[in-house]
Regions:
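Intrinsically disordered, low-complexity acidic regions enriched in Pro/Ser/Thr
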Residues: 1-182
Length: 182
């Protein structure tokens, strides 16, 4: 599962997510009519960097290999599928080739329509040949990350994996799009 060490991948920091409630939500915002289930794992509060791994040679249209949220600087020594923990949100279903990572607390003051409007204002300013991602802020304090994981419409499900350090503590969350190709 050492995707970040593969010779054909490169890592880019695409932002950070603030966890203030101890719970995180990860979903494709566009096909939704309501906010989805949160991840059940209770997390430490803090600001955590979000990394994007993509193919570097040759570049691919849907070149994202994985998205990783880093909770601790320690390296994972083992990975577990989220469904192993009977988490109700054990995978990432995406239809519109995008994803959104945030603390669940933002949904107290947002609707899915207002969230999509915010994303549209920022995401439409990108260069068409670039992978798109952006950092969003709510109430000038809660940071969230939006990204596109391909071009066009898909109906796919990918696994969410929790990474654990040598103290058996959660240190990473990995959304694995294409690592089976490496």
């Amino acid at each position: 599962m050492k995707i970040y060490q593969h010779q054909n991948s490169e890592k880019t920091k695409i932002g950070s997510v603030d966890i203030t409630s101890g719970q995180m939500t990860f979903f494709d915002p566009y096909p939704q009519t309501h906010f989805p289930n949160r991840l059940d794992q209770i997390l430490d509060n803090g600001n955590f960097e979000v990394l994007l791994y993509k193919f570097k040679n040759p570049p691919k249209d849907n070149g994202i290999i994985a998205i990783e949220v880093v909770f601790k600087n320690s390296e994972p020594i083992k990975w577990q599928d989220a469904n192993y923990f009977e988490d109700p949100k054990s995978d990432f279903h995406y239809t519109n080739s995008c994803g959104f990572i945030s603390d669940t607390s933002i949904f107290q003051n947002e609707t899915i329509i207002s969230l999509n409007d915010r994303i549209d204002k920022v995401a439409t300013t990108r260069n068409e040949n670039e992978l798109n991602y952006c950092q969003l802020e709510f109430d000038n304090k809660v940071k969230c990350v939006y990204f596109e994981c391909g071009i066009g419409w898909y109906d796919q499900v990918v696994d969410l994996k929790w990474g654990f350090d040598n103290e058996e503590k959660i240190c990473r969350l990995l959304v694995d799009f294409h690592s089976y190709l490496l």
